[in-house]
Amino acid sequence: MKKLYFILAILFSQLAVGQNQAPVAVNDTLIIYHEDSIYKAAFEIMNNDFDPNGDTLAFDTISYNGTNQVSFIEITVSYSRFSRIIFKANPGFVGWDSIQYIIRDVATPTLYDTAMFYIFVAQKSSDFLDLNNIKALIDVDVLFYDNKNYVNGFEVPKGNGKGTIFAANPWVAGKHNNTVYSSARTFGGQVTPMDVTWRSGGPISNSYEGFDFHLKWDRVWKVTNIDLQYHISNWFYPNYQPPQVFLDWPAHGDTTNGQAFNLAPFVDKNNDGIYNPYDGDYPQFKGQQAIYFIRNDYQQQNTPNRMDIETHGMAYVYDCPSDSAINHTVFLDLTIYNRSNKTYDSTYVGLWGDFDLGNSDDDVMACDVDRSTFYVYNADSIDQNNGSVVGYGAYPPYQGVTFLKGAKQDDDGIDNAFGIAPYETINGIGFGDGITDNEHWGMEHFLPFASYGSTYTGFPINNQDYFHYLSGKWRDSTLFVFGGNGHISGGGTNPTKYLFPNGSDAYFYGTGGVVVPNVWSGSYNFGDAKGIGSTGPFTFAPQQSVELTMAFVFGIDYTTQGNLAGLPIMQERVDSIRSYFLNDFQSVCGGTLINSIKDETGVKQKQLTIYPNPFNNQFTVAYETENQSAYLAIYNLMGVKVAEQFINSSKTVVDVSNISDGIYFVVIQDGNNKLHHKILKQ
């Protein structure tokens, strides 16, 4: 009888196992940052696994055969062998990796299933410009914002842990058939598990689906003169290997996916129209260090009517420690393509910024109309620390954003004048220079706005809001007005293009020639104020592009305390940068600050000395001419020539008693040599 019971027990046990179903393991996918680590607990990985019978599941076996770093932490619970997987991507690794795991039924260990834990290591979506005294983070989605750690990415002076800009991004808006379209991002997207689709990297395409698309385009390309010079000097040798970034340079798009064929600019050594660094071709860039990015507006925030525009950006810096202006400036070139089939009229482009100058609780925003600049400064004399955020103390700086070249004005067949009448401006370029249809707007509008609260001065939430802010209106469609908080409810009456010009509009351009009080200073009643400067309007036709050049200029006075001390420093640096831009980047560093290394031998730079400087009516030019004579010209801050003469000896006295006091620039043309020097008459 006992033997019979034993046999029956075995039969019933086998029958139960036969009726029990095996667990189901489901593949997992996770996205991580470039060179990052992940820590995944067993229950997280098994979260989508299940047992049809409701039994408890446990890890049984985990195996990995890749090249990255993987480790397992064991658990003390008897039925589970592993509690956590640690994965760390090796330097330079991008793309797919995988870990195999087996789960088992705790009640019936012979029942199990196998699945894969896929890990997608994203491209390095950001990199730093760090050649001068600013360390600036450039991400494919956003400028100067560390969207991995949620902190400021614009450190200045470099290495001191203090920053002035939390984030910045271009905004575009226009009308088509009286419907408003816009493309605007603020802080960009984050690479979090399964959130890669919120990244905006890559050209306008038919399809943005798939990890391979994001692997190729969710990145930036950092190039340097060192790599460029190496390539130029060695590309023709057998077995030469170009720098990896040269091989990856996004010169061409995939036309089968609807992308434009020609994308990032390059020097075509053999003029065949095809980028190939093994033929000597190389990226074309500005500065001695540059970061290039391409983004689309397929994914964007709060803008359902997207414009189908493609933005190419090049941020760059120069290595010139002896020039304080160059040493404290980051440049940005934007080329924006209309890849749609729509013609947008009344189009504006702006630069939005969240400016956290040290401690952001006491920041003030204002603008300098004549210098085509908006800026942030401290509201009181001391910029205190705020928790982990380091303030600038008793020497708070100024951080400016300058429109060196705004949007091109629509062609009208005339040379529009420098002035305040319609189709004229006082802070653009090409106005009144005798050349037809070469005019570019300067900064046409500026406003700070609140992060929250007001229904008319708060953060934009739809296409109409973005268009209004870019074109000089509040969210309730009322024009900016001079005085108060810039809204008609604040007491102002006269329409204006600019809020808080702080006495900088010498021609009263912003108010259409109406004379208004000389000073209207910034206010920080907006809370954590953010600001937008814009340029336009212009017509944006299909397949056309618009080009802008911006400069982020930092100024600080290390000898004088107080919140006003840094203003003249920033203004002087802006003046220098604007002059350099108008004169092919001639700098005190010696000759031209090159936009890219030329494939030829450079000319040895001559030495130029001017004294006294500052001066009253006369100054002396000490310069050894290479030719029998050299041509000297003096320009004011607007690029207008105010004096000229020839240099025929090693020392030449120049009399400029007939010009007013101020900052000027001396340009000497000596054969192929062109030298530049800033002077101050007082």
Predicted regions and their residues:
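Sec-dependent N-terminal signal peptides
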Residues: 4-13
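Extracellular interdomain linkers/hinges and stalk-like, low-complexity segments
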Residues: 18-57, 98, 107-125
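Residue-level detector of functionally pivotal "anchor" positions at catalytic/ligand-binding pockets or at interdomain
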Residues: 20-28, 59, 583-611, 625-626
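Surface-exposed or secretory-pathway low-complexity segments enriched in glycine-proline
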Residues: 40-88
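Short strand-edge motifs at loop-to-beta-strand transitions and within beta-strands
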Residues: 83-85, 546, 650-654
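Extracellular recognition modules
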Residues: 86, 100-104, 665-669
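A long-range scaffold signal marking pre-active-site subdomains of enzyme folds
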Residues: 122-593
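C-terminal outer-membrane/trafficking sorting elements
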Residues: 600-611, 615-682
